[in-house]
Regions:
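N-terminal secretory targeting modules
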Residues: 4-5, 16-162, 166-188, 371
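Sec-dependent N-terminal signal peptides
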Residues: 6-11
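Conserved SGNH/GDSL esterase-like catalytic core that processes O-acyl groups on lipids
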Residues: 64, 132-133, 172, 178-276, ...
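Short, conserved loop/helix-junction motifs that constitute active-site signature segments
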Residues: 154, 250, 286-289
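Structural recognition of the beta-strand scaffold that forms the well-ordered cores
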Residues: 158-162, 167, 204-208, 253-258, ...
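Sec-exported extracytoplasmic/periplasmic mature domains
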Residues: 167, 201, 205, 260, ...
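Glycoside hydrolase catalytic-domain groove-lining segments
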Residues: 269-294
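Extracellular serine-dependent O-acyl
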Residues: 293-298, 306-343, 352-371
Length: 371
């Protein structure tokens, strides 16, 4: 009986201390190895990355942001801030795998161990939306005495995908259409955008966000939302407006715009405002990338009525643009029918994304002469 009371008392003491916020955090062993800061010049970044907050820490929140480096040694670890989220990692071009940074404190995750001694290459892609997690990459940890070496040059071919939840990879790892949104089932690596880019041997950026529209975000007011894609597009980080993005840092030869699913997915929309804002946004994109070919896409999710309206609008915009700009194009994905399954909340499944990539690839190969 005495033992039981002691255990109960200990439990109460711990609970009271936790409630008071006075729990002392554990002291962990120091990180062993050579720490390489995120600002190291031999680390390559693709995507919108900011060092404004801390010159040695890389901040980002768009899915598809990629970090690459070549290193000496037999192991590699990665440092991130607490709860940064999920990445896909690939070592020496082998099978990619998913890693997560979900600890309450700064995280260290092993990406590779027991590699043959020599030079190796790591590619790490952020595969979720980091708006609420505020992800930070803080560097790599190498074996003692080892260091980074010059990495192979990034591909000369560059693509930018501007999109919404489809391009993000919302629910792509789920196999149940009734599942809610979860970071655990979002994965940009598995999207049509990444598959297309890999197939074309191109680097790509993804300026995409679930729920975003060109004039009206998901289920927004008929008059539109102020925080739509045209407004967010100017900034380095989504929904953080203290740093404008320098478009000279990344000039793609190809831009694919896939916006409209959220604008038109619920009934309270104004098709004329959609067209007006799309025209203005197209001019903005052209002003940022004067030499790029721009393709306006329609996605696979809208119903027949809304999809028909969207296609008519984009066809008209394209025809008008082509009077003075011959490098504006159109492409429609086929509708998802359910035969390939659905991801979470009726979004495209992994197989549907593969089908989308298979549809888009021949069009882009011919358009860009990228064989």
């Amino acid at each position: 009986m005495k033992k039981v009371w002691v255990m109960m008392l200990a439990t109460l003491m711990v609970s009271s201390t936790m409630m008071a916020g006075n729990v002392k955090k554990s002291t962990t062993l120091p990180i062993e190895g050579e720490i390489v800061k995120a600002s190291h010049p031999m680390i390559q970044y693709v995507g919108r990355v900011s060092f404004a907050k801390n010159p040695d820490v890389a901040s980002f929140n768009y899915p598809g942001t990629t970090i690459e480096a070549s290193f000496q040694g037999s192991s590699l670890k990665m440092l991130c801030s607490p709860k940064t989220g999920y990445f896909m990692a690939q070592i020496d071009g082998c099978e990619p795998f998913k890693v997560g940074f979900n600890a309450e404190r700064d995280s260290v995750v092993t990406l590779a161990a027991a590699l043959p001694k020599g030079v190796h290459h790591a590619k790490v892609m952020y595969v979720i939306e980091g708006l609420f997690r505020k992800p930070e990459f803080r560097g790599f940890v190498l074996d003692k005495g080892c260091h980074l070496v010059e990495a192979p040059a990034l591909p000369e071919r560059k693509i930018e995908f501007i999109g919404n939840l489809i391009t993000c990879g919302y629910g792509v790892e789920s196999i149940n259409r009734s599942d809610p949104f979860e970071d655990e089932t979002e994965n940009h690596w598995l999207t049509y955008a990444n598959i297309v880019s890999d197939s074309l041997k191109a680097q790509h950026t993804s300026i995409s966000r679930s729920g975003i529209g060109v004039y009206r975000n998901y289920n927004g007011p008929k008059t539109g939302d102020a925080d739509n894609m045209p407004w967010q597009y100017e900034y380095t980080l989504f929904d953080q407006h203290d740093e404008k993005w320098d478009f000279a840092k990344y000039q793609p030869q190809l831009v694919c715009i896939n916006l409209g699913t959220n604008d038109l997915s619920t009934k309270n929309y104004d098709i004329q405002l959609y067209e007006k804002n799309y025209r203005m946004f197209l001019k903005t994109v052209r002003s940022k990338y004067p030499h790029a070919k721009i393709v306006m896409l329609t996605g696979p999710m809208l119903g027949e009525k809304e999809s028909s309206k969207q296609r008519t609008v984009l066809d008209r915009i394209c025809a008008d643009a082509n009077k003075t700009d011959k490098n504006i194009y159109r492409f429609d994905f086929s509708f998802q029918k359910g035969d390939l399954g659905y991801g979470a909340s009726w979004h495209p499944s992994m197989l549907q994304h593969r089908k989308m990539a298979a549809e888009l690839l021949p069009f882009l190969r011919k358009l860009m002469n990228w064989n």
